[in-house]
Amino acid sequence: MRPMVASIKTALLLAALSFTAAFARADTYSWTNLQSDIPGVATHADPNLVNPWGMAVPSATGPIWVSDNGAGVSTLYNQQNGTARSLIVTIPTAARNKGGGNPTGVVFNGTSFFKVTLNGNSLPGRFIFVSEDGSISGWNPGLDATHAIIAVDNGTNNGTNRAVYKGATLGVAKGHNFLYVTNFRSGQVEICDENFKRVNPTGFADPNSTGATRHSEFATLMVRFL
């Protein structure tokens, strides 16, 4: 019986090794640089991809929308191969900003809310952008195919009230949609209702908002709705 036992042990060992090897192969990844603003670094070169920050997708197969902080635009890339699409969306600036746009966070909006207005016409911003100059803007091709439109300008405020936005996300609470944006300057997460109006909901208290560790000592960067 010893040979049979040995054979069984050998078979089990080989099966275990095969399983381990298969599992290891399934858990490995290869790194491919698809896009860069620097020629020769990636498979494709895009001069607009300067300091890319936020990313958003409208669907599982839709293009990736990227906030190009250093170029003031949003560029689009195919998920399948990383190639760039022809559409380039210019992000507007706060009134106080005399330079170019500096978008950071971006989020896809599939709701009928968060409307932006141009020439008396209002449509939902399909992609909502926040910027370091304190502006929040939305893009809808029915209003302007190549430019986002300002919805909020908190970059003209004085002192600590002047916003520096870094991240954005959407969420639903009590049946209503809300936009959450991080204000790097104030160290807070600001909340806007479906009309881009800032709200101050109750029910949450930050134990570090007073005392030795005040919120002003922190700089909020990104945000996610759980």
Task: Give residue ranges: language-model regions.
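Bacterial N-terminal signal peptides
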Residues: 9-21
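Sequence/structural signature of beta-propeller domains
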Residues: 23-226
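N-terminal secretory signal peptides that target proteins for export/translocation
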Residues: 1-7
